[in-house]
Amino acid sequence: WSDPKLMNYGFKTSDMKHFGTAPGIGIVIQTGKYQGRILVPLYYNSNSFSGMSGAVLYSDDNGATWHLGESPNDARAAAGLSKIGMGEIQIVEMPPEGDDVSTQLKMFVRQSGGVLIATSYDGGQTWAPDMPRDPTLVAPTPYGGCQQSVINYSHPIDGKPAVIFANAAANSRSNGTIRIGLINENGTNSEGRINYTFDWKYKKVIRSGEF
């Protein structure tokens, strides 16, 4: 390994206060226009907005150079919408729509009481302003929610691509639950892109001494 390189100075602006990587994992985009892009989720706040915003650092040259993508809150501000306090984030990849099309990404956002989901159509460089709350993915209200994990599963389940999500599914940091979400196609948007939704079909509560 080479010596580690402190990257804050290249991306942390003078307005930013906290600037840190989100717990969990980064991903490498597997399909589509941005295949091979490395994504590292992070979150930050600033003097102009005390709540957290989520974004990704991305690299298209195996980590030689990095770029800071925008946050869904940037899109919300541009659209005249209020920014939303975002906690730690994780990213998963949706099924491919074609080699020359950027594969959609979903950002799972930690927030008090539940999980928000944002969508990127350009490999994480920008995000749509909408961050709907998934009603199934409950989370603690205190502490601004709780750390969560979500990954793409390596094989289809019930014939569909799937993700695995884990968090404290209660109003407190308890009831640790793993869920399997089947990825469904739910029509298309105004630009002809597929609307992907999750069917949280299976779950398992983690209990001490058993699984």
Model-predicted regions and their roles:
Residues 1-211:
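Asp-box/BNR beta-propeller blade signature and adjacent active/binding-site loops
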